[in-house]
From Swiss-Prot:
This is External core antigen. Its main location: secreted. Residues 186-208 are annotated as: 3 X 8 AA repeats of S-P-R-R-R-R-S-Q. The gene is C. Residues 165-214 are annotated as: Disordered. Homodimerizes.
Length: 214
């Protein structure tokens, strides 16, 4: 299996240093977390069960439908677009290598091992990575991070003390907006005091002017 990893690294042609870290470190098993620079961690993603993530094919179709123009653009759009490009390129190289190994291995057992390893281990990591960056682009990074924390708290709470259904990512933006509005109310309540002071100042000036006239 280490030989397979070595072939994977040699064949991976990702264009940037960050993508090289993804292929050399994350898929190799080094302690490199591709989510840290985005405020998340591998452990935070691991709270989501494997069947939560759509298939790679569905995720690639979603990325193409929503962000194809930005992904194909030579310009730098955002770190999430860049990471998404790199993940797509890495997965393409992984599948090409797995296909090559599968067609050139005479032993059916070894062929099945390679295919299962790619689909189970590397496939899950790529599904997590694609889902994370697509979700950040769609809902916003802060919303996704809030969802991961909420789901982590929910899944670790005993069933008797938690809601029956897990949090839903698509409903979090509504609660986020409400919270922002609630946070914005406190300064608004404080604003009348300076206004009253300002409104009082002309009155005082008028009273002073009247006294001077008298």
């Amino acid at each position: 299996m280490q030989l397979f990893h070595l072939c994977l690294i040699i064949s991976c042609t990702c264009p940037t240093i960050q993508a090289s870290k993804l292929c050399l470190g994350w898929l190799w098993g080094m302690d490199i977390d591709p989510y840290k620079e985005f405020g998340a961690t591998v452990e935070l993603l691991s709270f989501l069960p494997s069947d939560f993530f759509p298939s790679v094919r569905d995720l690639l179709d979603t990325a193409s439908a929503l962000y194809r123009e930005a992904l194909e653009s030579p310009e730098h759009c955002s770190p999430h677009h860049t990471a998404l490009r790199q993940a797509i390129l890495c997965w393409g190289d992984v599948t090409n290598l797995a296909t090559w190994v599968g067609t050139n291995l005479d032993d059916p057992a070894s062929r099945d091992l390679v295919v299962n390893y790619v689909n189970t281990n590397m496939g899950l990591k790529i599904r997590q990575l694609l889902w994370f960056h697509i979700s950040c682009l769609t809902f916003g990074r802060e919303t996704v991070l809030e969802y991961l924390v909420s789901f982590g708290v929910w899944i670790r709470t005993p069933p008797a003390y938690r809601p029956p259904n897990a949090p839903i990512l698509s409903t979090l933006p509504e609660t986020t907006v409400v919270r922002r509005r609630d946070r914005g109310r406190s300064p608004r309540r404080r604003t009348p005091s300076p206004r009253r002071r300002r409104s009082q100042s002309p009155r005082r000036r008028r009273s002073q002017s009247r006294e001077s006239q008298c």
